[in-house]
């Protein structure tokens, strides 16, 4: 690749990107970040690299390119766009898109990668509009992956750190849903049942006009029924041992 300066490399990279030659585009942008790291073009080159890498299915490499901007160019005027691009990479992984090692070898989707990127969004831009929904998505992935503790942690942060967010009501309902998934029946430990009841109640009290009220009422009724039956089971247990002890 023969270019005279950073501007020429950027122009050639854009041309290659538009033509779908992502490998060539990466080569031109690599020249910019390697040879002209202090130029005004360097952060944009990293951004364009991330776009080419996403097209090649190299999602974590795309994230790494975006992180170079966050770490090296924190005053970049389009910082929020970078956070949005990171969010988009995580959402792509969450959707089940096939990653490609080295851009050509298909591999398995690793949903933990999406969680990692969403966590980075929250850490790097805690006051952005992306953070609350990133936490919600972490909880959804974690629940699907049977990582309830991770789901609880994300939802707890969403409820406490972003109480005015449009996703706060969903967080209460999601918290109740995750606790409900842990309920094994009236014969078992009722801590998840009590917690589910608590969050269903909170949802109905705090968000009485939300569209999911009927769903919350159904969940609350089911959990209250389970808890009531657990009281009967415990009563039968004590009655039996009191009379047969």
Each model region followed by its residue ranges:
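Acidic, polar-rich low-complexity tracts and alpha-helical solenoid repeat scaffolds
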Residues: 1-245
């Amino acid at each position: 690749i023969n270019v005279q300066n950073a501007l020429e490399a950027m122009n050639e990279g854009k041309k290659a990107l538009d033509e779908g030659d992502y490998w060539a585009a990466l080569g031109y942008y690599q020249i910019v970040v390697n040879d002209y790291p202090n130029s005004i073009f360097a952060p944009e080159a990293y951004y364009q690299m991330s776009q080419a890498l996403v097209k090649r299915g190299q999602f974590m490499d795309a994230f790494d390119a975006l992180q170079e901007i966050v770490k090296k160019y924190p005053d970049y005027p389009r910082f929020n766009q970078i956070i949005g691009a990171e969010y988009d990479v995580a959402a792509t992984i969450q959707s089940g898109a096939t990653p490609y090692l080295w851009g050509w070898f298909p591999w398995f989707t690793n949903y933990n990668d999406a969680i990692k990127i969403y966590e980075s969004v929250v850490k790097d831009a805690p006051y952005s509009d992306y953070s609350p929904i990133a936490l919600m998505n972490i909880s959804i992935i974690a629940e699907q992956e049977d990582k309830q503790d991770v789901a609880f942690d994300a939802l707890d942060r969403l409820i406490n750190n972003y109480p005015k967010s449009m996703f706060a009501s969903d967080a209460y309902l999601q918290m109740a849903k995750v606790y409900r998934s842990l309920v094994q029946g009236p014969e078992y430990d009722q801590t998840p049942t009590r917690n589910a009841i608590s969050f269903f109640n909170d949802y109905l009290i705090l968000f009485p006009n939300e569209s999911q009220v009927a769903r919350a009422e159904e969940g609350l009724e089911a959990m209250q029924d389970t808890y009531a039956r657990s009281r009967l089971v415990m009563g039968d247990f004590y009655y039996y041992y009191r009379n047969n002890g």
